[in-house]
C-alpha cells in the first residue's frame, strides 16, 4: 500500500512517501534521496523494500528550499536544478530531519519500532551523519558524497553500518574512499564493499552508470543486512 504522510519535525512539517508491506507489523526503512528529490527511482526503491516486508518511508529532504521536488535523472535541466538545491542544502538541519523521520516511523502503529536508514549520494551522507549522531537500528550508505569530510565523527557510530562504493566513482576519489575504509575499519559493526569498475550511482534504476550485476550484488547484501538487523 502506498501513501503520503506529513511528518512534524523539529523545524516544521514536511511530506514523505510511504510504501507498506502486505504483512504488518513490520520494521521500517527510512529511504533518503539523491539530488533528484523523492522521484520515481526513490519511490520504486521504497516499493521494492515494501515487497520484501519493510515499511519504507522517503522524506522530502529539500522541503526548506522547495517542496515536493521530483526530478528526472535523465534530464540535464533537472540535474542542474538538483545540483543547485544540493549545493545550498543545510546538512546539519537535514540530519535532524532524518532523526525526526526515524522517530515518526518508529511510532507508526504498524511498525515494530525497529528502524533503519538507507540513502544514496546526498542521502548516503545523511545516513552516515544520522548514524554517527543519533540513534538508529541500522544504516546503509550507497556512494555517500563528502563522507570523508565527516570521518572525525565516526566514533559516534553505534549502529551496524553497511556501505557500498563504486571504485571508479567520479564524485568520491580513490583517496577519499581509502580514508573512509580506514576510518570504518576500526568499527567492528561496519562493513564497506567496493565494486570494481563501477561509477557513481551504479545501482540507480535508469541511471547512466547502472550495472545490473553490481546492483544486484549490492542490493542483495543490503536486503540480507536489513533482515538480519531489523528482525
Describe each model-derived feature in a short phrase:
Residues 1-231:
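N-terminal cap/leader regions of alpha/beta-hydrolase-fold enzymes
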Amino acid at each position: 500500500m502506498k501513501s503520503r504522510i506529513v511528518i512534524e519535525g523539529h523545524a516544521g512539517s514536511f511530506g514523505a512517501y510511504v510504501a507498506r508491506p502486505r504483512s504488518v507489523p513490520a520494521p521500517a526503512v527510512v529511504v533518503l534521496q539523491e539530488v533528484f528529490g523523492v522521484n520515481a527511482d526513490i519511490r520504486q526503491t521504497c516499493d521494492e523494500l515494501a515487497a520484501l516486508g519493510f515499511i519504507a518511508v522517503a522524506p522530502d529532504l529539500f522541503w526548506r528550499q522547495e517542496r515536493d521536488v521530483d526530478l528526472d535523472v535523465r534530464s540535464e535541466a533537472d540535474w542542474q536544478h538538483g545540483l543547485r538545491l544540493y549545493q545550498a542544502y543545510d546538512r546539519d538541519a537535514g540530519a535532524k530531519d532524518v532523526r525526526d523521520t526515524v522517530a515518526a516511523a518508529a511510532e507508526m502503529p504498524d511498525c515494530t519500532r525497529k528502524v533503519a536508514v538507507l540513502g544514496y549520494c546526498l542521502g548516503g551522507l545523511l545516513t552516515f551523519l544520522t548514524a554517527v549522531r543519533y540513534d538508529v537500528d541500522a544504516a546503509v550508505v550507497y556512494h555517500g558524497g563528502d563522507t570523508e569530510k565527516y570521518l572525525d565523527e565516526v566514533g559516534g557510530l553505534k549502529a551496524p553500518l553497511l556501505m557500498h562504493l563504486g571504485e571508479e566513482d567520479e564524485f568520491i576519489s580513490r583517496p577519499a574512499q581509502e580514508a573512509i575504509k580506514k576510518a570504518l575499519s576500526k568499527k567492528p559493526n561496519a562493513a564497506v564493499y567496493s565494486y570494481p569498475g563501477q561509477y557513481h550511482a551504479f545501482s540507480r534504476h535508469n541511471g547512466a552508470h547502472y550495472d545490473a550485476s553490481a546492483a544486484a550484488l549490492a542490493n542483495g547484501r543490503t536486503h540480507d543486512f536489513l533482515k538480519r538487523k531489523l528482525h
